[in-house]
Amino acid sequence: MAHVTREQLDRLLDQALLLDDHDALACRLDALARGYESGEMSRAAILVLAAEEWRQAGRPATALDRFRDALEDGGEVPVDPRAGIADTLFELGRADEARKVIAEVGARGWNPATALTIAETLAAYGDLDGALEWATDGVLACPAGITIRDALLRTRYRIRVDLGLPEDDLDALLC
């Protein structure tokens, strides 16, 4: 069993970036999650990192399993694992399932980081109206001065430009 530190995870991530070996990193993160006893981040957060690496390695089905494991674990994560589940379902060509997961997130509560992820996912898969709604709701849920709010404002602005909409009061906050 292992106590996992942020420094340990940072080293793993740095090595993977240098080697461009997402498979190896995903396997190491899986092993850390299996042996997890305690740490500076939750087991669920490690599972989400593993899921993201499996996606980068071209193995979306394995990524989907890890996102689901993170959701089942229930530990603290910056972004709701259901956002990753939805994105991966879109990637797998299962858009109807992805939309159901997104609707569930909307109905059960979310944080601004989750709203950003869902907005970006919907925009990537062509649902600009849905993406705009998530980005707008995310902005409105954030207090001023929060970094994620700026990211939501930028995403929202890009979506509005893609939709051909004129600048509005929220767009003006981008200064």
Predicted regions, residues:
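Flexible helix-coil transition and linker loops at the boundaries of alpha-helical arrays
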Residues: 31-40, 70-76, 144-145
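Residue at a conserved register position within TPR or TPR-like alpha-solenoid repeats
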Residues: 16-19, 54, 89, 122, ...
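Alpha-helical adaptor scaffolds
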Residues: 41-117
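TPR/TPR-like (Sel1-like) alpha-helical repeat modules
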Residues: 107-110, 123-146, 174
